[in-house]
């Protein structure tokens, strides 16, 4: 029988539900070397964490994250709070010598991200960052194909993450406040596609240019559930329209859209685009990678498929092939879920990552590489470089962004 490890969840909300589901489901679909026990969830006084605990299967609830992180009963700390609250519990977990998993971006500022990565490296503590899209079978398979040299030398990468939920009717919330979120679409969406393309291609961004950052909606109405600090849940933000609020307006201090160009360490070039008001794109999270022997293309709105172009075939029969990444013998993770061709969904990426985390903690190799605090710090450096480029209107060398 597998050894047990007690999990503490710091935070609730959208990601709290996603992570709770993953920790609760992982031992049902996989045979992890450690059995995760959903020990305690933390929430602020007004969040009523006891209700969350009862609904999502946590044995205990707490309103004191510091005591929870330091408790000798806790084996791993998982952080899902708003971005500005990531660093304190993460540093406390590292100081206590405990493995720490954290949502992305790992911090609201580059300085905090660097401090967290350095602390983890110094303490030699295992850390993990929930760049969950790495665990989509199609993305993990693409990573394997590139490592095998299937598409040859990479020349171009185009990545975009487009959503359309943040129109003028959406009220003010923490996601629109820089001191709480760090950034808008940039940290929320570009962070994912920077990590995904870094993971799939194996390339590092060396320079950034041509960046544009824009905020289209400068003010948003504060809804009644908000006490004035912008701390409302994602559900309140997305489903309570602005006419449910008061006459008071909140100043939006983050971006609605950020676009930028890059050059990679092998000489390849690329582009990135993140937007929350790209009408018609509900969760169009995708990329295309072009190599000398072929290309790969992915869009999360069709997450079970990967597009592959084989340029080594005779010219007369060349064309894009749609691969259903649902075959347990060939595609990562899917054998542990449903029979072949029975598709999986968003939540399974988290469950698969929980499994790989447990493998790593038991000294075993994960299915594909897990992102740690240093990986997230490298992503944060690119985010910072793009914003510097947008502000200063010049090329930015990543070597100068630390």
Question: What does each of the following model-derived ranges do?
Answer:
Residues 1-56:
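N-terminal Rossmann-like dinucleotide-binding module
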Residues 35-39, 360-378:
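Glycine- and charged-residue-rich phosphate/anionic-cofactor binding loop of Rossmann-like
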């Amino acid at each position: 029988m597998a050894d047990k490890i007690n999990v503490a969840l710091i935070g609730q909300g959208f990601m709290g539900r996603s992570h709770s589901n993953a920790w609760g489901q992982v031992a049902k679909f996989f045979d992890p070397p450690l059995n995760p026990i959903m020990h305690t969830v933390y929430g602020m006084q007004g969040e009523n964490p006891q209700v969350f605990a009862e609904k999502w299967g946590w044995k205990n609830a707490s309103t004191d994250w510091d005591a929870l992180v330091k408790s000798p009963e806790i084996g791993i700390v998982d952080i899902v709070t708003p971005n500005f609250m990531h660093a304190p519990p993460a540093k406390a977990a590292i100081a206590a010598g405990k493995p720490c998993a954290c949502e992305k971006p790992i911090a609201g500022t580059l300085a905090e991200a660097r401090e967290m990565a350095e602390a983890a490296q110094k303490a030699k503590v295992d850390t993990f960052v929930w760049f969950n899209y790495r665990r989509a079978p199609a993305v993990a398979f693409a990573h394997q194909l590139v490592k095998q040299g299937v598409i040859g030398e990479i020349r171009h990468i185009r990545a975009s993450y487009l959503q359309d939920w943040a129109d003028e009717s959406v009220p003010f919330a923490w996601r629109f406040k820089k001191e709480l979120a760090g950034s808008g679409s940039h940290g929320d969406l570009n962070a994912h596609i920077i990590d995904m393309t870094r993971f799939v291609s194996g390339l590092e961004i060396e320079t950034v240019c041509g960046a544009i950052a824009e905020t289209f909606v400068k003010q948003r109405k504060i809804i009644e559930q908000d006490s004035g600090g912008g701390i409302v849940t994602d559900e309140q933000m997305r489903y309570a329209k602005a006419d449910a609020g008061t006459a008071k307006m909140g100043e939006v201090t983050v971006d609605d859209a950020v676009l930028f160009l890059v050059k990679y360490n092998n000489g390849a070039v690329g582009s990135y685009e993140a937007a929350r008001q790209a009408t018609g794109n509900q969760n169009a999270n995708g990329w295309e990678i072009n190599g000398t022997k072929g290309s790969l293309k992915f869009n999360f709105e069709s997450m079970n498929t990967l597009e592959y172009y084989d340029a080594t075939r005779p010219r007369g029969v060349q064309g894009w092939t749609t691969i259903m990444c649902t075959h347990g013998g060939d595609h990562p993770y899917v054998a542990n879920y449903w029979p072949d061709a029975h598709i999986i969904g968003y939540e399974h990426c988290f469950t698969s990552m929980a499994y790989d985390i447990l493998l790593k903690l038991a000294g075993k190799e994960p299915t594909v590489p897990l992102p740690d605090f240093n990986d997230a710090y490298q992503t944060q450096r690119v985010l910072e470089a793009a914003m510097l480029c947008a502000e200063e209107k010049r090329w930015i060398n990543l070597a100068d962004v630390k």
